[in-house]
Curated annotation (Swiss-Prot):
The chain crosses the membrane at residues 4-24, 29-49, 60-80. It is an enzyme of class 7 (translocase). It is a multi-pass membrane protein. It comes from Baumannia cicadellinicola subsp. Homalodisca coagulata. The gene is nuoK. Belongs to the complex I subunit 4L family. The lineage of its organism: Bacteria, Pseudomonadati, Pseudomonadota, Gammaproteobacteria, Candidatus Palibaumannia. This is NADH-quinone oxidoreductase subunit K. GO terms for molecular function: NADH:ubiquinone reductase (non-electrogenic) activity; quinone binding. NDH-1 is composed of 14 different subunits. Subunits NuoA, H, J, K, L, M, N constitute the membrane sector of the complex. Its EC number is 7.1.1.-. Gene3D superfamilies: 1.10.287.3510.
Amino acid sequence: MISLSYSLSLAAILFMLGLTGIMIRRNLLFLLLGLEIMINAAALAFVIVGQYWGQADGQVMYILTVTIAATEASIGLALLLHLYRYYQTLDIDLISEMHR
């Protein structure tokens, strides 16, 4: 069995990878992908801790988190499509300049 510290380290690395993607990228699609990675890392941490404590609470939180992530992804992609049709770009800086 893999220890708790290794498993939570993996979840933390995934979370940091998503956060790095959000901080570095200027494209809205990549920001949405980074956010999804962060949400999935948090869900993984819920499952790991629930398994460690021997309770099903982690799996319940995982189902809730995945449901919220799916909702966020569908709404986010719909907004991205609308922005792309209107501005013909997904670059945050260009959209901000065009808005003024």
